[in-house]
Every structure is written in structure tokens, then in C-alpha cells.
Amino acid sequence: MATAVPMKKNWSPSMKHNDMERWICIYPAYINRKKTRQEGRRLPKENCVDNPSYIEIRDVLSVSNLQFLMENKKYCRENSSEMEFRGRVRVQLRNVDGTLYNNDFPTRESIMLHIASKIPQLKTRQNKSGDSYHQQSQPQSNASGSGGGGGGKKGKGKRR
């Protein structure tokens, strides 16, 4: 028989630090450079990235020796409900006894700074920068008026 996902419990202070409900939540809006503080950005703009996705956050955390969980949740300040803007990542910050799970990341801000610094180095981000060359090399139209169509100025027409 297949095992089910453990039932979520309501949060209480008596929960242990390794319970899923005590893990910290990270939404892509927290590290999005295009968001304002009012729209949910948590870090300074110079430390953020443009339009991160929860998949990119997952890719960074998977190599960072942290325990995390993906959830299909929508950020409450996000206006769009499209699938590309959905997603939340829960990260374990502390062990059962309250000690840090990973000494490199003592706070939630340190985890977000690490994620924001590593996302631009992902291969998916490096491939996107090469597309600007193809957009600029569009054919130019000839403005010499020797073509058909009888150039000249056209007025607004008669007012009726």
C-alpha cells in the first residue's frame, strides 16, 4: 500500500523544530528584484534576481546540503494566479534540539541571500542571456519610397 503524505497539523509552540510546520517558508517574491518591499520583497534590490521561480530555488537548495520541501501554494500578495507564479519552498533551519541544521545558514536571510547569489549561475539563467542577439537582428525595412504603393504624406482625411 502506498504511503501518504503526513497530515499537516496546526502550528503550536510545543512543536519540535524538525516538524514541517516549523520550517521556514520561502516564496520567489522574497528575492524578486522587480517587486517592491510592499509587494513582498525581503532583501535589498542589489542582492535580488529578476523573476526567480520556485524551480530555480529548488535547484539551488538541492546542492546546498539543506532539507527542503516543495509546496504548490500561492503567495498572498501575488496578483496573478498562473502556475509560473505559484510555489513555495519550506526549508529546515534547526534540528530537534534547536541547534542549527547547517552552520553556514544561521538565519532565513542568509538562506535567501545564498539562493539569490546562486540563481544567476544556473545554466538555465545563462542560456537566457543569449536570446537578446536574435531579437536585435531583425530585417530593416527600406524607407526610400521607390517601392510600390505611391509614397507621400497622407492627411487625416476630411472631417465629417
Swiss-Prot record:
One of its GO terms (biological process) is SRP-dependent cotranslational protein targeting to membrane, signal sequence recognition. The keyword Lyase does not apply. Component of a signal recognition particle complex that consists of a 7SL RNA molecule of 300 nucleotides and six protein subunits: Srp72, Srp68, Srp54, Srp19, Srp14 and Srp9. The keyword Nucleus applies. Component of the signal recognition particle (SRP) complex, a ribonucleoprotein complex that mediates the cotranslational targeting of secretory and membrane proteins to the endoplasmic reticulum (ER). Binds directly to 7SL RNA. Mediates binding of Srp54 to the SRP complex. Residues 123-143 have a biased composition (Polar residues). It is found in: Cytoplasm; Nucleus, Nucleolus. One of its GO terms (molecular function) is 7S RNA binding. It comes from Drosophila melanogaster (Fruit fly). Belongs to the SRP19 family. GO terms for cellular component: nucleolus; signal recognition particle, endoplasmic reticulum targeting. Residues 122-160 are annotated as: Disordered. It comes from the Eukaryota. Keywords: Cytoplasm, Nucleus, Ribonucleoprotein, RNA-binding, Signal recognition particle. Its main location: cytoplasm. This is Signal recognition particle 19 kDa protein.
